[in-house]
Structure formats: C-alpha cells, structure tokens
C-alpha cells in the first residue's frame, strides 16, 4: 500500500516540497538562507501578532502603548526586542540570499528571480511602514521625508502624497493606515513566497558548479532538512543573543523621544538595512532623479538575467567576474556607511562615486566581463 504522504491530497504537496524533493547533493551553506527567510517571516508574524494585541494605532497613545508593552506585558520587552531585531536578521538573510543568487547565476531561473525581487520590495515596504508605528522622532520624520519623495512626480506628486498621508501632514490617519499595511503585508509576503517556491520547484535548485545535477540528486529529507535545522539553531541563537544582550544596538536613539512635528532631528536616516539605497537617493541633487535612482537601485536586479553574457552560469570558474562581484559587495558596504553620515564634504562625493560604481557594475562591467571571459576561452 502506498504511503499516505504520497497519496493524501494535502500531504503529497508537502511531501513534494519538503520531503522527497530531489535536491542537488552538493549545495553549500549559501543555500540555507531561503529556509532561514521562511523562519524569519514566521518569527516576525508571530511576534508581530502578540505586539498587535497590545499596540494602539493612535498618535496620542502609540508611543505609550509601546512603552506599556515593554514594562507591563508579560515578556513584552522580549517580544518587542525579537521583533525589532528580527527585522535586521531578516534583511541580513535577504541580502545574503540575493548575493548567493547573483554569484551562482540562480537568476537564470527568471520566474523565481523576478518573484524574489518583488518579495524584496514587499519586505522593504513592510519594514518601512513598521518603523513608523512606535511614533518616535525618527519614525515620524522618516515617514515624512520618505513619503514626501513622491511629490517629485510631475502633476500628480502633491495629490499623491496627501492621499497617502490622509491629510496635509503625517498625522493620525497616516499612522492608522500604516498599521493596517504593516499587519496585512506579511501575509502577502507569505503568499508570494509560496509562488516563489512553486516556480523554484518547476526547475529544481541550482548548485555551486552551475551544471545540471539531475544525475546526482538526493531527497531533501533527511539530508537538507537537518542542515536547515542546524541553520535555524545558529540564527535563533544569534537573534536571541542580540535581543537579550544589546537590543538597542541597531536602533536609533532618536526613537526614544516621542514624535514632535515642531522639532527636526539633526540627522534623519532610516534603519541600517536601507542606508545603501538612501545613500543612492541622496547622491543625486535632483529630487525626481533621486527617487528614480532609489527605485532603480532595487529594480536593476530584474535586469541581471537579461544582461548575462557568459556561457557559464555561475562565477565559480570565472575569476574576473568574482573580482567584480566582491567589488559590488564592497561598494554596497561603502554606500551603507555613507547613508549614515551627514550631507557634507567628503561624504557627498564618496556617495556619488559609490552610486556611479554601483550602477556601472550592474549595467556595464558585469556583462562586459562575461563577454570577455567567453573570448578568453575561445567560446564564441
């Protein structure tokens, strides 16, 4: 008699995705981040749900309700610290997951890759509206500055901004709708993740060599289920360590001050995981140009599959492309540093150079290098 997990309508879907899934036997630890992102999402949804039970989305009580969660709710301080730092771990895993996809040429699975870029945008949007909810100084001014960027669009800009605000400034209506979006979007992300997995399982996973691995595949369980479990343990130890020992390490001190529309903080900046995009935005003197550069800094990922010129899939056997990949990583670190610095010399110039290098690597250097490597190997 056939096993129930292979015949039951629901269990056979789970079986095909997590148990009997044929998996390349040589995938490295860089392939762990997909499951870690799933864990991050579940952690964020659960901690967020418990926070939402005690939070009030009203400008007169939002800040106090967060303080109340930390002081009076059982383990509220822990739930809040895990949720706040969970976002940082989420983005660390996201950026490493994208970097793995770029290094090993996983972007050639176009449907999976494009859904992934949409997931990245959705996650960034969720994190942005979530940062506004505690209604501290940086929450308020971050919301004001970033939403105001939409006014750069010709004709419809001002109307668009007021429509998003629900009034003539960031106010109660803004906070209420941002809370609604912050609650809703993680479930949209969960749904999009299912589609991401569906597309991935149409083709199967890539592997570090970039070659077809059909001849050498193993079942996902027990080999990679235990490998994922090991990754879960490491990440949860890291997350709880940060949440317990230095919960405010990655936050902004300005957010301990309740929002005040009459006092502007000296340096308005987003959370650390958005600093690279913020640096690109600031490096262009024109408002509309900055907004478009900000958008394109993420959307450029959608062009990567189209700009792939090499006859080889990954960077494993392509030393020149490896150098450029690590140059891109270094460039993103420079942009992250610049995003947190004040707008003055020499930071402005460094930001402009780093932004130019960022787009030049994606649009010119990487495609050109792929073509050059083909020539060097006589692969016309």
UniProtKB/Swiss-Prot annotation:
Entry keyword Cell cycle: no
Ligand binding (a ubiquinone): 201
Gene3D superfamilies: Cytochrome Bc1 Complex, Chain C (1.20.810.10)
Binding residue positions for heme b b566: 97, 196
Superkingdom of the source species: Eukaryota
GO biological process, one term: mitochondrial electron transport, ubiquinol to cytochrome c
Cofactor: heme b
Other comments on record: Heme 1 (or BL or b562) is low-potential and absorbs at about 562 nm, and heme 2 (or BH or b566) is high-potential and absorbs at about 566 nm.
PANTHER family assigned to the protein according to its UniProt record, in alphabetical order: CYTOCHROME B
Protein name per UniProt: Cytochrome b
Species per Swiss-Prot/TrEMBL record: Acipenser transmontanus
Organism ancestry: Eukaryota, Metazoa, Chordata, Craniata, Vertebrata
Gene behind the chain: mt-cyb
């Amino acid at each position: 008699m056939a096993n129930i997990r292979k015949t039951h309508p629901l269990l056979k879907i789970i079986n095909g995705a997590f148990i009997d899934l044929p998996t390349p036997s040589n995938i490295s630890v860089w392939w762990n981040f997909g499951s870690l992102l799933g864990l991050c999402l579940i952690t964020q949804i659960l901690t967020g749900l418990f926070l939402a039970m005690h939070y009030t989305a009203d400008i007169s009580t939002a800040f106090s309700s967060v303080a109340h969660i930390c002081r009076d709710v059982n383990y509220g301080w822990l739930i809040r610290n895990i949720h706040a730092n969970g976002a940082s771990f989420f983005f660390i895993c996201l950026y490493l997951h994208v970097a793995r996809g770029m290094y090993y040429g996983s972007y050639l699975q176009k449907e999976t890759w494009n859904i992934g870029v949409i997931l990245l945008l959705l996650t960034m949007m969720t994190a942005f509206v979530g940062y506004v909810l505690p209604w501290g100084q940086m929450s308020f001014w971050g919301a004001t500055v970033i939403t105001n960027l939409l006014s750069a669009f010709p004709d419809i800009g001002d109307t668009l901004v007021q429509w998003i605000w629900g009034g003539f400034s960031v106010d109660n209506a803004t906070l209420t709708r941002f809370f609604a979006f912050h609650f809703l979007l993680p479930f949209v992300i969960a749904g999009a993740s299912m589609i991401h997995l569906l597309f991935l399982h149409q083709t199967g996973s890539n592997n570090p060599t970039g070659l077809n691995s059909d001849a050498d595949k193993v079942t996902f369980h027990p080999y990679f289920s235990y490998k994922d479990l090991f990754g879960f343990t490491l990440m949860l130890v890291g997350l709880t360590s940060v949440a317990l020992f230095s919960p405010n390490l990655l936050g902004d001190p300005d957010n301990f001050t309740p929002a005040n529309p009459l006092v502007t903080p000296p340096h308005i900046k987003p959370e650390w995981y958005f600093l690279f995009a913020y640096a690109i935005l600031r490096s262009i003197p024109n408002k509309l140009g900055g907004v478009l550069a900000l958008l394109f800094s993420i959307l450029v990922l959608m062009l990567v599959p189209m700009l792939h010129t090499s006859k080889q899939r990954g960077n494993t056997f392509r030393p020149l492309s490896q150098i450029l990949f690590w140059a891109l990583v270094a460039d993103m670190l420079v942009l992250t540093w610049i995003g947190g610095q004040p707008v003055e010399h020499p930071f402005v110039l460094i930001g402009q150079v780093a932004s130019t290098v960022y787009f030049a690597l994606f649009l010119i250097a990487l495609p050109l290098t792929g073509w050059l490597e083909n020539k060097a190997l006589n692969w016309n």
